[in-house]
Amino acid sequence: MQKVAVIHTSPVSLNELKALFAELLPEVEMINIIDDSLLEEVKRNNGITPGIVSRMCLYGQAAQSMGVDLILNQCSSVGESADIVKQTVTCPLLKIDEPMAEEAVQLGTKIGVIATVGSTMKPSCNL
């Protein structure tokens, strides 16, 4: 059975993602790592901090030690730290908004971004 570790910055989308995994990827074991202090720290500091990067790297290492096949970064606001985590793990890491951004670039030249949290805008636009 394949395993995916999801790094969350809030429990808000946990149940929805669990339901999607169960429906679309029933053969994949979903492991959840939740640190709701990450998003608050991003908001307070208008971006990622060394502490966020450090914790994200620890979570990436923990996920890898669990033998996951993929790490999914669920929060765009910490996307820049996920880029650093990618350099510290051997398993693939996917930012949740990467496939959407890649598809948007293929479809058009003017791309609008709508976000539920202001701290998402910069990392999402930088994709």
Task: List each model region and its residues.
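Non-catalytic structural scaffold of enzyme domains
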Residues: 1-127
